[in-house]
Amino acid sequence: MAEAETNPVLQVIPSDSPLKENKKYPPELLQFNGLGWRAYYHCHPASRAGDHRFKGEHGHFHIFVRIKDEPEKWSHFVALAMNNMGQPIGFFTVNQWVTGEEWESAKKLIKYLDDIPFSEQKEVVEMWLLSLLIINRDLIAAVLVERDNIITVKKGQVPDADIKKDKGLYLLSEVPLDYKKILI
């Protein structure tokens, strides 16, 4: 992408139309050769109340994984925040109501990191996203465990509530990317 003077965000947003907030890019989603992963990019209005943003975030990729025993069902895996230059700045997780997918425990989701079909990808953005998951395996595992811990704590505070549907609870966990730690 660097040689072509582009980045992952520019790769999924059409160059012939203006960026629209809350719209999924690409519209048909990234499909990863039908091998159990999918993703899309979008951004939110800066003024949206209760929204989470990393400092300097332009938008983010939501990444999903197909549930192995139920091939028609998908689970939100993690979101990847991107800055205005199209570079990744952090991973985060959101509550179930945000994306409406099936909920899988951190323990189950972490196992998917051991089975990423990287070598079978042909599209550059899909290879790039999967490579970030591989390189940041430990960070992603930690953010998923923290996500589940937050749900457990909240459930303890309000036992009868369905915490995963609580619209007052958007962000569950986050971790900024520190390239010095990743590359050393």
Task: Give names to the regions the model predicted.
Residues 1-32:
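N-terminal domain-onset segments
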Residues 12, 33, 50-55, 85, ...:
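Low-complexity, charged, repeat-rich alpha-helical/coil interaction segments
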Residues 38-39, 110, 168:
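Intrinsically disordered, low-complexity segments enriched in small/polar residues
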Residues 66-134:
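An exposed acidic His-Trp-rich patch
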Residues 125-184:
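Long, compositionally biased interface segments
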